[in-house]
Amino acid sequence: MVRPSVLEKLQAVQPLAELWWDSSPLVYDAWRRRMIAKADDPREMTVCLDRLFCDANPPEQNLFRGVTTNPRLTLNAIKDNPAYWSGWIDDVIRADRRADAEAIFWKTYKEIARRGAGAFLPQFEASRRKYGFFSAQADPRARHDADRMTAQGIELHGLSPNIMIKIPGTAEGYEAIRRLTARGVPTNNTVSLVISQVVACMEAVSLGLREARAAGVDLSGWRSVITVMSSRFGTLGALQPEAEEIGLDLSESDVRWAEIALMKRACRLIEENPAYPGKMLLSSMRVSPVVDGYTHVWHLEKIAGADIVYTLPPSFLESLLFQAPDLEFTNQWAEPVPPPVLEKLLRIPYFERGYREDGYSSGEFTSHPALQTTAKEFSLAARHMVEFIAERLRLFS
């Protein structure tokens, strides 16, 4: 009998917690084959991965309960099968020789989202719209345009009822979340890094729900999650530089605790706010730290037991399954950050501000260095897709 995987052990601590696939479902089969080929015990790995997701499973038996994507992950789906997508794009060009690269980009982006959502639509239907959501992101280049993000969200959601719209944590993004919620469109607040953004999202969703209910909008297929990009807060911002400026030496464990402290606080805020009927979603996790020679995954261990969503990219899953397969979990999410560690972290302005509910105004969200870096990364991926399509167009000129 094959032993429970590390992911099954995590979910056993809190059965309401959800595991999502952080990539396009279109790349899952190729990734699965690579993982099995790399495994010391291919049979055990096959069983493990087929428990995560397999078309042959009854939908309710798959451990993966949803999907998150972004432009970079959508681009990866094209790179995973470039010959096919080149041909598909060429057919689009032939069908409409007047379409430019941006128009074909958007059509291609929607098609990859539609197919990915289709892989989880059976679960969405079997669970009566509780699980099986597919997060498709509005164009990150429009992150300061509430009108455009709202229109794109409505268009993307129209492709499949289980498509949830990822909207970034900018002031304009929260306005778009309010508008989409008022229409009954499910949302995922992405590029969220600090507690002020969590508060802003809860407020936007609560306002949108009030409007939706007043207008009699059908909310049976609606849902909200708030994504905290955990390690991006610790590694892309000013945590280490500001610590050095005031003479603090931060260990790898300290950095992980900083990220975990934010997630724990966000989970508590949701528990205390019944007007927000959504969940936190934990992303950007790391296999870390190593303590006394033992490899930990504190992003999972210290949050285990919380009723949240964990979204798991292929690279993290590979590290987890090969480096920490014997990890055990106990219910730790409500346990406080060690007081000496929290006191140390609160001396760092970057952390102290991120930890406070009023640390940032909505207009200041876009100034956060980790948000800026992440938004540029996602925007660059969108531009790369446009450039790929422009190359195909040049073949027809």
Model-derived features: where do they sit?
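Active-site-adjacent beta->alpha loops and helix N-cap segments on the catalytic face
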Residues: 143-149, 167-181, 194-205, 293, ...
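Hydrophobic faces of well-ordered beta-strands that scaffold small-molecule active sites
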Residues: 17-23, 40-50, 65-69, 132-138, ...
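Active-site-proximal loop/turn and secondary-structure-junction residues that shape catalytic pockets
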Residues: 25-27, 71-73, 110, 135-142, ...
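Catalytic alpha/beta core domains of metabolic enzymes, predominantly
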Residues: 186-333
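C-terminal extensions of enzymes
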Residues: 325-397
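An N-terminal structural lobe/cap that precedes and organizes the functional/catalytic core
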Residues: 32-42, 50-83
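N- or domain-start disorder-to-order transition segments that initiate the globular core
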Residues: 1-48
